[in-house]
Design a protein with these regions (language model features):
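Solvent-exposed loop and capping/linker segments of extracellular ligand-binding repeat ectodomains
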Residues: 4-633
Length: 633
């Protein structure tokens, strides 16, 4: 027990960011009372116990509510109207934080039905940043958790790999505005009714999460997508023949056209228990047309090499088209499905000479991109998909599958200037090639979240310009690599004006220009990453934070020996910067040229005690700043 007067450890509490003024209620069904605590805008915690009429908390737009609880469950039952204690009210909000803070910070789910109905019909809009940390679930733990949340557009990630009976049953039933869900439900062993009715009535959902399990069990997918009237893509891996026993009415009421990817499985069932009637079975690249218009296939330059692809709208009749500087144009209606294949080994010969999709139609890309390379198992030529979707109206690529291999420049500018793109594909490769992701998402101004980047070994220019000018990007991917290469992160996030926090940068030995211009003009960046490296390289940090006008404190710079141009223009134009710690013992101007130009007029510079030759000015210690000798903690 915490001693009296001991400050409570701050945690990632369940948090509501209020979008519209109103009330948040803490309600319960009869005899289902539960006590929790809340605080508003960081003030004092207050205990409240749910009532049948609801304890009301008045909130204004932009208020922040935080919640915590010591309960093992919230009293919900396995009925669609079986609420226990739950949130309600008139205010709309985004939910974030770690849900375990409602369960006494338990590392494991403490009970069955633990979080059942917790947000039943609440006005939550986004749960994208709500963390459901449990990898092993209990029976009915998330049963009807968001049932009837008609404002919900974005669901949380669902990382659990060990399921339990009824664990996700009806979790999002009736979420009629839900459009974004996990692109994969990772569990490979199913339990009875585990996903039954999970997305029942989610009438705006277009693409289902990937279902990797190979074997089915009683009602595991029963009514899973019932009345998902816009659903047009399902990717499964099960070899069990679907039937009333496993998949009863799972695709009743889905869209009339769609793509079903069986991963090569041999079962053959159509209708409401299998592949929806009217859908095409295909594993390769497909476009789901979301807004009517044209799809074009164009050659960027007459000096380039024309490339041929084939398309089909029925899965049996294929039409070949060859790129030209006057684009080939095909008209489609909203809801149409277009399958694509090709026999080329590359669709560009350089960054200037490429064939690309374009047109006026908005579309989602799904399936395996390798159908364009004759279903090869790996990329065998540079520039393979260079600029393939450049400046097109692609909206989502979250279900587009890319290979685990890379090749030099293979994804160069693949989605460059796709201003409608909101979700990126997974990038599974761990062995990279030079310039493989160069400019891949540059100028994707609607992209808010970057894909994971799992590689731990960098190669030359691998992520150079990758997210440059992605002005809506709020979350950067983790960058775990400790082995860097020349220009590997060069310009990676330049102009990402919505980025507030940088990823950790654990490397202790650097490479030439490795972080050069990495966060230039990230004007919302308030927190810089630690920079632990003591072995620097030429231009390693040059211009790294240039123009980061919200940055107030520089990361500690522990290196005692500098390299040529290592800190050149590093904090240039960081107008809020007022604290720098640099432990260099010697320098010349070109190592720190204009590194502190146009920073705050007053501040503190902490230096190595043995360093006595720092000059005043933008290429040394800013005039008007206090100078303090560094002391070991």
């Amino acid at each position: 027990m915490m001693a009296s007067g001991t400050p409570e450890i701050e945690r990632d509490w369940l948090k509501f960011d209020i979008l519209t003024a109103g009330t948040v209620l803490w309600k319960c069904a009869t005899n289902k009372e539960r006590t929790i605590s809340y605080r508003k805008n960081g003030e004092k915690w207050t205990k409240i116990t749910s009532t049948t009429s609801g304890v009301s908390i008045s909130v204004a737009k932009d208020d922040v509510l935080e919640f915590k609880g010591n309960n093992a469950d919230y009293g919900g039952t396995r009925k669609t109207s079986g609420q226990g204690s739950y949130f309600a009210g008139t205010a709309t909000f985004n939910a974030s934080g770690n849900i375990s803070t409602m369960l006494n910070n338990s590392e494991t789910l403490p009970a069955t039905l633990a979080l059942a109905h917790l947000f039943h019909s609440a006005k939550v809009v986004s749960a994208q940043d709500l963390i459901l940390p449990y990898m092993t679930l209990t029976s009915s733990c998330y049963y009807a958790m968001f049932y009837g949340c008609t404002n919900l557009t974005t669901a949380p990630e669902l990382p659990a790999t060990t399921l339990a009976d009824y664990c996700y049953q009806y979790m999002f039933r009736g979420c009629t505005n839900l459009v974004s869900v996990s692109n994969k439900l990772p569990a490979t062993t199913l339990k009875n009714y585990c996903y039954s009715g999970m997305f029942y009535g989610c009438s705006k959902l277009v693409e289902a999460p990937y279902l990797p399990a190979t074997g089915l069990v009683s009602n595991c997918y029963g009514s899973m997508f019932y009345n998902c009237s816009k659903l047009q893509y399902i990717h499964t891996n099960f070899s069990t023949t679907p039937s009333d026993t496993y998949t009863k009415t799972w695709v009743t009421g889905v869209a009339a056209k769609g793509v079903f990817d069986k991963n090569g499985k041999t079962w053959n069932v159509t209708g409401v228990n299998g592949v929806p009637t009217g859908w095409l079975e295909y594993s390769g690249l497909a476009f789901i047309i979301t807004t009517a218009g044209t799809i074009t296939w164009k050659l960027s330059n007459a000096s380039g090499t024309a490339k041929t692809v084939s398309y089909s709208t029925d899965g049996s009749t294929w039409t070949s088209i060859t790129s030209a500087t006057t684009a080939v144009s095909i008209s489609f209606s909203a809801g149409d499905v277009v399958l694509w294949k090709g026999e080329e080994t590359q669709y560009a010969t350089s960054s200037s000479y490429y064939s690309s999709f374009g047109g006026t139609a908005y579309f989602d890309a799904v399936g395996n991109i390798m159908s364009l390379l004759n279903n090869a198992s790996s990329i065998t030529n540079q520039y393979a998909f260079c600029s393939l979707f450049r400046a097109s109206r692609i909206c989502s690529a979250s279900h587009l599958r890319l290979p685990t291999s890379t090749y030099s420049y293979c994804y160069n500018s693949m989605f460059r200037d796709c201003i409608s793109l909101t979700t990126a594909p997974e990038l599974p490769a761990t062995n990279l090639a030079s310039s493989c992701y160069y400019s891949m998402f540059m100028g994707c101004t609607s992209l808010t979240t970057a894909p994971e980047l799992p590689s731990r070994i960098m190669v030359k220019n691998c992520y150079q310009f990758m997210f440059m000018y992605c002005s809506s990007l709020t979350t950067a991917p983790e960058l775990p690599a400790k082995t860097l290469a020349q220009s590997c992160y060069d310009y990676m996030f330049r102009g990402c004006t919505s980025l507030t926090t940088a990823p950790e940068l654990p490397a202790k030995t650097l490479a030439q220009s490795c972080y050069q211009y990495m966060f230039q003009d990230c004007t919302s960046l308030t927190t810089a990453p630690e920079l632990p490296a003591t072995n620097l390289a030429s231009s390693c940090y040059s211009n790294m934070f240039n123009g980061c006008t919200s940055l107030t404190t520089a990361p500690e710079l522990p290196a005692t020996t500098l390299a040529s141009y290592c800190y050149e223009v590093m904090f240039y134009g960081c107008t809020s910067l007022n604290k720098v710690t640099c432990l260099a013992t010697s320098y010349n101007r070109y190592m720190v040229n204009y590194w502190l130009y146009n920073v705050a007029s007053t501040g503190t510079f902490i230096k190595n005690v043995s360093m006595t030759s720092w000059p005043s000015g933008a290429s040394g210690i800013p005039e008007g700043w206090d100078v303090v000798d560094y002391e070991e903690e």
